[in-house]
From Swiss-Prot:
Pathway(s) where this gene product acts: Amino-acid biosynthesis; L-arginine biosynthesis; N(2)-acetyl-L-ornithine from L-glutamate: step 1/4
Gene: arg-14
Subcellular location per the Swiss-Prot or TrEMBL entry: Mitochondrion
GO cellular component terms attached to this protein's record: mitochondrial matrix
Primary enzyme class: transferase
Any single biological process term in GO: ornithine biosynthetic process
Biased amino acid composition, Low complexity: 81-93
Protein name: Amino-acid acetyltransferase, mitochondrial
Family: Belongs to the acetyltransferase family.
Known EC number: 2.3.1.1
InterPro entries xref list: GlcNAc_Synth_fun, Vertebrate-like_GNAT_dom
Natural source organism: Neurospora crassa (strain ATCC 24698 / 74-OR23-1A / CBS 708.71 / DSM 1257 / FGSC 987)
Transit peptide: 1-47
Activity regulation (record text): Inhibited by arginine.
Length: 712
């Protein structure tokens, strides 16, 4: 029934074309209402595919109809200047607008946003022109573009009583500060594709302030650098101008360079650049314009414009929009403190994203030796990644240095530090997305290569996932396209040539301020090993562990109360360690279990102690957001138990799909309600290990206060 409803909604889109502006699928200010009505109502994956196929199939049909109508106008003598126009738009602009809208809807549908994602998007971007303002007449039973209001307002989508939202005219706009590196090296197809994506972000409520970075040009004369910047600015303006109004504006007088060094709080990065003319940014943003900022700054000493570092401009803009830019006097900081104490907002805009579009893509993975970091928890991973990149910029022990590797590592290092500096100025829910122009433009290289390759070259290509635009996907879901805890085999397309397979992997990195990760005992000091019997070991009652908060985490995550006394007694002699994310927002308890029929001494001597994930918990408010589950899981499989771990879950547990994607294997245990998972590479080929794993997963006693419910 639901699939049929979605298909009828899709048909309503096609049939409603004639009721909108010429050739457009979307009326003015309706983009977000449309998106939420159709694509964010928690459609299943199959329904999403049905919608995508429906949109794609109607494109060719509409083009044929328009061609027939145009032919009639040219051939029939009755269709003269005074004859009524056909209901089909005939201009190339109208067709382009319609096709562009259709592509936009498909890209949104491909984001696979869930109910939780939809609620998060609404909470951030809901108070927009696309939503009903207070005092306006409520829509009739026929919604936007013929979609019934009963479908658009399904109870499964909006929980609780719907309230009309009053939109304030002085509401701060949602902004993405975007850096385009080396645009002079992009061809027109890439640039236009990126421009299209940025206008789509605008349609979804996120305005871009674009900073050009042309530092790869090393001219002999300063004038040629200025010519290059001017040329690239004009190219970008033309590209954005192809995709509707309001058009982009150049802000060439807003960034200033100071020769003085004002005393600023330590939490604000030191920067010679600042926004000297704020209205040059705030006024056009209030009118919905995308802004383009050339890498130039006005010096208050020389009274001239000169070259400026693009990263410094990004930091200056972020500081300004966040309301953290102040003058030279200490009184400015006292005024800030007064505003904060009075609850006044001093932000000029809400910076939700910082986007870096770089030909090199995201940050390379330092753990796997190839591929790209999918997600970076800066609070926990920044130093290790920075050290790995810095090492590549230095000469080897033999005194040699690969210039190409060093140059790329330097760029990645600058982008990583830019992410760290900007996120330090922004709320914890802000993020930095680093991607390549091809991915930002949604140019599907892997599919194109698949079509061009020989049939026998892609035996496993069907296992690759749907290609999605990483920027649109992240805006709607606040997640990377792929989960960071997925094994590389789940992401990498299979190909006979390993280099070709790696070239098709995603190159987008999502960075967040994230959470600190604490592991007891610390595996960086001593690697976790099966404990010798009788040796003192960690206990959950030790002072380093906040037991009440740990119990609350477990109770909240599982939705039931733990029998604390029984649980402490059960794990007191088997505890391997504990992982804590943030302030007990997520965690894992891991043990060394003894197979049935063996004593601990024998199991230790024979190497048969089983590494077991006893509890994996995430606070409900943190589930599906911020990557808390991925952070905990990564800490477990990379740091705590890198050689493998097993665990069990009820066969009907909804989280089993998540477990399955991250495990090496799964086995439904006969004559029980348990499914067993493991990450140990050699488990399947080791019969004794598999029997021990199964024995432990069958016989672990549950420790819940309510024994009437099935064990978890």
């Amino acid at each position: 029934m639901f699939v049929r409803t979605c298909r009828s909604s899709c048909n309503a889109w096609t049939n409603a074309t004639s009721t909108t502006q010429a050739g457009s699928l979307l009326p003015p200010n309706a983009h977000r209402s449309v998106v939420l009505t159709l694509s964010l109502q928690a459609c299943s994956a199959r329904t999403h595919e049905s919608l995508i196929r429906s949109f794609a199939s109607t494109t060719s049909q509409s083009k044929r109809q328009e061609a027939e109508a145009e032919e009639k106008r040219q051939v029939s003598p009755r269709l003269g200047p005074s004859a009524p126009r056909s209901s089909y738009p005939s201009s190339a602009e109208a067709r382009q607008k319609r096709d562009s809208d259709r592509e936009f809807l498909i890209s949104v549908l491909e984001s696979s946003a869930t109910k939780r994602d939809a609620r998060g998007y609404l909470q951030t971007f809901g108070s927009s022109a696309a939503l009903t303002s207070a005092g306006q007449k409520k829509p009739s039973t026929i919604g936007i573009l013929g979609v019934p209001a009963s479908v658009a307002g399904r109870p499964a989508f909006v929980q609780g009583t719907e309230k009309e939202i009053s939109v304030k005219r002085n509401e701060a706009p949602h902004v993405a500060v975007v850096k385009l590196r080396a645009p002079q090296a992009w061809d027109d197809v890439l640039l236009e594709g990126v421009a299209k994506t940025l206008t789509r972000l605008r349609d979804l409520g996120l305005l871009s302030v674009i900073v050009l970075d042309c530092d790869d040009i090393k001219p002999n004369q300063a004038s040629s650098w200025h010519e290059t910047v001017t040329e690239q600015t004009d190219r970008l303006l033309r590209a954005i101008g192809q995709y509707g109004f309001p058009a982009a504006e150049v802000v060439d007088s807003g960034i200033w360079k100071s020769t003085e060094n004002p005393q600023i709080p330590s939490s604000v990065p030191s920067n010679p650049l600042y926004v000297g003319f704020g209205k040059a940014f705030t006024t056009p943003l209030a009118n919905g314009h995308i802004l383009v900022v050339p890498p130039r700054a006005y010096s208050d000493a020389s009274l001239q414009y000169s070259k400026a570092d693009a990263n410094d401009i990004v930091i200056a803009l972020t500081t300004f929009f966040a309301g953290l830019q102040f003058g030279q006097q200490s009184s400015d900081y006292r005024q800030l403190a007064e505003k904060v104490s009075d609850g006044q907002s001093f932000r000029k805009a809400l910076v939700d994203r910082v986007i870096v579009i770089d030909p090199l893509g995201g940050i390379p993975s330092h753990r796997q030796g190839h591929g790209t970091q999918v997600f970076i928890n800066l609070e926990d991973e920044f130093k290790n990644i920075q050290d790995a990149l810095y090492e590549k910029t230095q000469p080897t022990s033999a005194g040699t240095k690969d210039a190409g590797v060093s140059a790329r590592a330097t760029v990645h290092l600058e982008n990583l530090r830019l992410a760290k500096s900007t996120l330090a100025l922004l709320p914890s829910n802000a993020s930095v997305v680093m991607t390549s122009p091809a991915e930002a433009a949604n140019i599907n290289v892997s599919r194109r290569n698949q079509l061009e390759a020989k049939p026998d070259g892609f035996a496993g290509e069907v296992k690759t996932r749907t290609w999605r635009n990483p920027l649109i996907h992240n805006l709607l879901t606040d997640r990377p396209i792929y989960s960071s805890s997925l094994p590389i085999g789940r992401i990498k397309p299979t190909h006979q040539d390993e280099e070709i397979a790696l070239s098709r992997m995603p190159t987008t990195t999502l960075a967040k301020r994230g959470l600190p990760v604490t592991i007891f005992p610390d595996p960086r000091v001593n690697r976790w090993q099966p404990p010798q019997p009788g040796v003192p070991r960690l206990r959950l009652t030790d002072t380093c562990i906040d037991l009440p908060r740990l119990v609350h985490l477990i109770n909240d995550s599982f939705g039931r109360k733990l029998n604390v006394e029984h649980y402490l007694d059960r794990v007191k002699d088997s505890l391997a360690g504990i992982i804590i994310a943030g302030e007990y927002e997520g965690g894992a308890i891991l043990t060394w279990e003894t197979p049935f029929g063996l004593d601990e001494e024998t199991a230790y001597r024979k190497g048969r102690l089983v590494p077991y994930l006893d509890k994996f918990a995430v606070l409900r408010k943190s589930q599906g957001a911020g990557g808390v589950a991925d952070i905990v899981f990564n800490a477990m499989v990379r740091d705590a138990f890198p050689d493998g771990v097993c665990w069990r879950s009820r066969k009907d547990n909804p989280v089993n799909k998540w477990y399955f994607e991250r495990s090496r294997g799964v086995l439904k245990l006969p004559e029980s309600n348990w499914a067993m998972f493991w990450t140990t590479p050699e488990a399947v080929s080791n019969d004794q290990m598999m029997r021990d794993y199964e024995d432990v997963c069958r016989n672990i006693a549950p420790s819940w206060a309510d024994t009437t419910k099935p064990a978890d």
